[in-house]
């Protein structure tokens, strides 16, 4: 059996957000790649959460499964225009890191259950000065995520600016909670 390649370090910010998430939460790691967030969270908080990792990259998901066999994986083209078949009842928490596809943002927000959380961190305008990504299609404008959130989300944390670790970049972070329905 081949040992999977080492993971890149997880986002410290996402790890901090996880400290506030409820026990027993079902978490979707969206565009999970090799599992740097779901695997690290699963090891940091053993038995506290259950995970579904989705990505289109079969090799990355195979490495994730070898590393963390208890995590459910789903290979799917995240930019497919068909209805997503992996999200029948949504998730308590949705994690997105270093991924942006604007045409599906509304669908992505819809994956968060009522009372659930969204933790989104990706590159933003200005990152061109630091290299990849530099294509505007993959860079958020300041305030863009907040402006796109449905009205039933409350923003808990927001940042748009430069970071220096793990390497210099311009990023945007948004943590939000979807409000429970009022019956």
Task: Put a short name on every predicted segment.
Residues 1-22:
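S-adenosyl-L-methionine
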Residues 57-59:
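Conserved SAM/SAH-binding beta-strand->alpha-helix loop
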Residues 116-126:
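Conserved beta-strand signature within the Rossmann-like core of class I S-adenosyl-L-methionine
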Residues 100-109:
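A short, conserved alpha-helix within the catalytic core of class I
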Residues 84-93:
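A short acidic, Gly/Pro-enriched loop at the edge of an enzyme's catalytic core
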Residues 50-55:
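Conserved SAM-binding motif I beta-strand of class I
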Residues 24-33:
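Conserved class I S-adenosyl-L-methionine
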């Amino acid at each position: 059996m081949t040992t999977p390649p080492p993971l890149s370090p997880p986002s410290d910010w996402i790890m901090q957000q996880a400290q506030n998430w409820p026990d027993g939460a079902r978490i979707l790691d969206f565009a999970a790649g090799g599992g740097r967030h779901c695997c690290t969270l699963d090891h940091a908080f053993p038995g506290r959460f259950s995970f579904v990792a989705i990505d289109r990259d079969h090799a990355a998901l195979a490495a994730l499964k070898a590393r963390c066999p208890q995590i459910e994986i789903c290979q799917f083209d995240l930019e497919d225009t068909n209805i997503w078949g992996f999200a029948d009842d949504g998730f308590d928490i949705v994690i997105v890191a270093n991924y942006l596809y604007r045409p599906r943002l509304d669908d992505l927000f819809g994956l968060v259950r009522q009372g659930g959380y969204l933790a989104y961190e990706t590159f933003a305008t200005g990152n061109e000065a630091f290299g990849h990504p530099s294509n505007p299609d993959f860079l958020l404008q300041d305030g863009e995520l907040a402006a796109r959130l449905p009205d039933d989300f409350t923003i808990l944390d927001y940042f748009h600016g430069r970071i220096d670790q793990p390497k210099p970049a311009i990023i945007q972070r948004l943590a939000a909670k979807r409000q429970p329905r009022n019956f």
